[in-house]
Amino acid sequence: NDEGVVFTFNKEFSYVYPMNAAGVKGIEGTITVELGGMLRLLPQDNMSTKTVGNAQGFRSVKYSVYGKYPYGVEQDSLLVRWRLQIPKDKKKNYNRGQKVLPENPLVFYVEQSFPDRWFPYIVKAVRYWNKVFEGIGYKDALLVRKLENDVSSVTPKALIAYDLSDPVVANNLIFHPATGEILHCRINIGHGLWKEERERYYLLNGLDDNGSFIDFDSQKMAGELLCRVLSEEIGQVLGLQTIESKSAKEDL
């Protein structure tokens, strides 16, 4: 890979379930677990830094400045952000108010294990943020594609994964400590997302729903729920701080 070195470990585990009743043989078998990783090279040309200043609601990295004052240390913070730049040959168009494609659009790859029926809702969640970027002059700043079967899930800069082992939704970022440039992000959508959100909705709005409960078993409703949750996670990996929702009913 041009950006680093990819490596994988495969480990095989054996298991045996004891007999549940006399004369009944226990279940046994093996399972192979693959652990992947990637050593990435930092960019040779550092992205320009941007201090937080009066900006509110953005993720940041704190650092200490030594030597500026003879008897003290100054604390400051850099905004955490992706490197989305305007191509040099399109700057005139951009200055005229035309929407332009960024030099390197951010591509969200969807892991192979993600069920196909949810892919349209993932696309919808990503395109929601494109409307935001259009407000600052970018066109199609975010793209979404399915990860090919022969490509390791550790290689994309932005990955949306389907987690069968963990019911929660989570994300993580890796960024350049000196510039705040985001280098990699991963969003995990837990298999238990819908069960958790159903319980949350009933807990917050059960008495106010007047008997017209939302049909969580509907694929359309489940897809719209995924779209909402995923759009919030995308906002966080784009550099926004977490915003807690006040009402599950308002969300849906």
Identify the residue ranges that each predicted region occupies.
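Hydrophobic face of alpha-helices
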Residues: 123-126, 227, 231
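Post-HExxH zinc-binding segment in Zn-dependent metallohydrolases
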Residues: 252
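Catalytic Zn2+-binding segment of zinc metalloproteases
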Residues: 234-248
